[in-house]
From Swiss-Prot:
GO terms for cellular component: cytosol. Its main location: cytoplasm. It comes from Proteus mirabilis (strain HI4320). It comes from the Bacteria. The gene is rsmA. Its EC number is 2.1.1.182. This is Ribosomal RNA small subunit methyltransferase A.
Amino acid sequence: MNNRVHQGHFARKRFGQNFLTDSYIIESIVESIYPQPGEAVIEIGPGLGALTEPVGERMDKMTVVEIDRDLAARLEVHPTLKDKLTIIQQDAMTIDFAQLAKERQQPLRVFGNLPYNISTPLMFHLFSFADAISDMTFMLQKEVVNRLVASHGSKTYGRLSVMAQYHCQVIPIIEVPPSSFKPAPKVDSAVVRLIPYKEKPYPVTDIAMLSRITSQAFNQRRKTLRNSLGGLLTAEDMLALDIDPTARAENISVEQYCKVANWLSSQQQHAE
């Protein structure tokens, strides 16, 4: 029997499809989401409905985003869900989540078993709509969750860690083995909850500047900051900001990156 076929659907590699089948894990995720009627609940990648069904039982209506037309068509005729669902057959990377929140007149509660092949770019896309989202609960590759929660000084700490922790409180929920899926992925998974801050602990005046310096620093993570960020500020500037110019990207905290971004933004304004 082909292990890529589940409930009559052939799992498509190009969409990174692995279907969750473990009832204990499903129940744990639904309890951590704790959906309530009337909330603006959005599921990304409902697949065959492993999470959609138990969440849908608690909701009067919900929205799902599904790129696979065959899976979207199955949901359209689902016996218990079809009258509750708004199905957006579209790539989640192209969705304006702020517009969805505006249409629903409240912040969104987003969840899903995210395709591992797009999980990191999708996280960055969602962070850009953090003000329109009340919380996010995702199944991700365990390695990605480790990066989301990593502290500065660790090898897993990177640009994703900085941007996630700038925008959100990040809470790991549960680890999930490959045997919980069909077909079984080659990696371990984990569930994480991200709660966008209503007031950022370290506000920045220009998020594009924070994005720029973290990209520049972590794209050359083996270099010292004196070299990776040397085109933006001098070693003396770094010392004035209490940052060691001989340190590497992973040794700088979220707060310090925010401080550098704000300083560079203010320098830019003065130059203008």
